[in-house]
From Swiss-Prot:
Pfam families: Aconitase_C. Heterodimer of LeuC and LeuD. Disulfide bonds: none annotated. Pathway: Amino-acid biosynthesis; L-leucine biosynthesis; L-leucine from 3-methyl-2-oxobutanoate: step 2/4. This is 3-isopropylmalate dehydratase small subunit.
Amino acid sequence: MITRGRVWRFGDNVSTDTITPGRYNLTKDPEELARIAFIEARPEFSREVKPGDVVVGGRNFGIGSSRESAALSLKAAGVAGVIAESFGRIFYRNAVNLGLPLLVGDTSGLRDGEVVEVNWRTGEVRTENGVFHFKPLDGFLLRIVEEGGILSFIARRGDLCIE
């Protein structure tokens, strides 16, 4: 699972309301959700984001309301995954359940707009300025993400058995 794309950098405490603001969040349609991702924080995001791009946050990325639409909007927009110093617990689980990879660690070396190559299995991120190492998802969660999310995982295996 190696991707290459542009960094979309955000700060600390990015809430699910920042990712998909409630007043726009009236649909479950992935294409519509992709259009509202970061509509108030970065209006250009939905027009300019490309498949393989990476969202980078600071501490507490995805805090706030229990909105599956926040993770779904990023995946639907083509975001390859999210790298942050820490995640809101519900966003973290929603992302895994939807098949959106996550890495955890110090993001201070990643700059907005730079191109990165991310190995989501190992946590290695290559930039023009060097190589950075992040904590990848553990084995079971990584397998769920690699299957495309929890529903695909169960459909292929018949249950949640990890053996």
